[in-house]
Amino acid sequence: MTEATQRTSDNGVSIWLDDLSRSRIESGSLQDLIANKNVVGVTTNPSIFQKALSQVGPYDAQLKELGKVDVETAVRELTTTDVRNATDIFREIAEATDFVDGRVSIEVDPRLAHDTENTAKQAVELWEKVNRPNAMIKIPATLEGLPAITATLAKGISVNVTLIFSLERYEQVIDAFIEGIAQADANGHDLKHIGSVASFFVSRVDTAVDKLLEANGSDEAKALEGKAAVANARLAYELFEKKFAEDPRWADLAAKGAKVQRPLWASTGTKNAAYSDCKYVDELVDKHIVNTMPEKTLNALADHGNGAPSIEGTYEESHAVISKLAELGINLKDVTDKLEADGVAAFIKSWDSVLADVQSGIDRVNA
């Protein structure tokens, strides 16, 4: 373990890798990151699978076994195999942490982002297909996704809620989570191993807000560049602490073994070269947090990160940042609404590419 990744972990942050591929599993790379860089979980998304499945070679043997199946079936077989194999690698960590960590996430078809019924249906299908207790099903935090989150948790299925950008939506996600756990309890499920994280996206907020600040051009605007995303995430953590401390339903559920839905910082790779490549890790360290990071960010953290606690005592400053943005005419809700819509659209585009790449693979191995 490196000093920085160990310190980050010791201060309450579970380090998950935001990447997965057949070659990463078969090469031993994933096991190496577990052994040497404190990695205790994995997240995937359509863009990650697009990158993985575009590789010619690693998936050919399985494609040959599948034969001339339809492309949707092939994609699900390939992706769930990777996730299943990864969950097996993490099983020891899952058991050692009482299934808090050792989790591997797989996302529902992004084309269902605004379809509650079919999102909930596919969540069950994916859970049963992977068939591992340390898997997590990713569901987007669209308005239509919220009831699907509750319905999925109510069946005892672990959920990673993704594409959260705003405090307003995050509060709705926490409410959907608590309601889902309450229903799971009423349905007779053991609450101890139902896991959930709320994936709150970080760096994309700075990318969007900084453009507006640059367009403003004032000294006040310049002083706020690179501050919106961390302030927004820190206020999400404030909300996390407040909601779980004050919601009367949660105390009863926790007494029955339910585990808190941890905030997960996503989109933590630095997009602006002027900022530290550890910015969205080092500035967001506290207890009961997950940070999922691309390997480049993980390597930066391991090499020169800090990992010291960095959220406590920052709420007043963070509220001030958001207020100053509003004074400059920047409505953060407008920004985050667009980021959610853009995020769904980007994942759909990636999924379409996945389907095209796998169809090419099917045609190639069956030629």
What annotation goes with each model-predicted range?
Residues 258-363:
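Flexible, acidic glycine-rich loops studded with aromatic residues
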Residues 12-16, 40-43, 101-105, 134-138, ...:
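Structural preference for beta-strand elements that scaffold enzyme active sites
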Residues 18-22, 47, 107-113, 140-144, ...:
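Active-site beta-loop-alpha junctions enriched in small/polar residues
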Residues 1-30:
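N- or domain-start disorder-to-order transition segments that initiate the globular core
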Residues 45, 106, 137, 152, ...:
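Conserved, mostly hydrophobic/aromatic
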Residues 157-296:
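Catalytic alpha/beta core domains of metabolic enzymes, predominantly
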Residues 48-148:
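Active-site beta->alpha loop and helix N-cap motifs at the rims of alpha/beta catalytic domains
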Residues 24, 115-121, 139-153, 166-180:
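Active-site-adjacent beta->alpha loops and helix N-cap segments on the catalytic face
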